[in-house]
Design a protein with these regions (language model features):
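RNase III-family endoribonuclease catalytic core
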Residues: 2-130
């Protein structure tokens, strides 16, 4: 059973995702995929910053005060902005009244919770989410 399914099945139990060396390796690996230089990865994964990454993987149900809600809002806005920007850059023919509706639908579909859940699954986030 996947971590996502386990978390759903145990919705009354608060799951605490791991925050040890494997979590740091996940974060470092994501930065490597983004082509960050090793010196920046070292800075961004210091103990203080790892606390912020931990917070970004913690739901309000797991910790009322230290959770990802503010990061979620910032991320949703950023993702939606990227989707719109990319659609117009990649498909300039969408820059018309009919295209606005198409781009709005793309933003809704790709910015949906299920899309982000699939990305989290593909990147192996579930063992680390609390």
């Amino acid at each position: 059973m996947s971590y996502k399914k386990q978390a759903t099945a145990m919705s009354s139990i608060i799951y605490k995702g791991t925050r040890g060396p494997m979590f740091k390796a996940l974060i470092s690996g994501l930065m490597e995929r983004g082509n960050l230089k090793d010196k920046y990865i070292g800075i961004l994964t210091n103990d203080e910053n790892m606390k912020k990454f931990s917070k970004a993987f913690t739901a309000a149900s797991a910790n009322k005060n230290e959770n990802y809600e503010i990061y979620e809002q910032i991320g949703d806005v950023s993702a939606n902005k990227f989707i719109v920007w990319y659609a117009y850059q990649r498909f300039p023919q969408l820059n018309c009244p009919a295209g606005v509706k198409v781009v709005a639908r793309l933003r809704i579909n790709y910015g949906a919770k299920n899309s982000f859940a699939q990305i989290a699954d593909d990147l192996g986030f579930w063992p680390y989410i609390s």
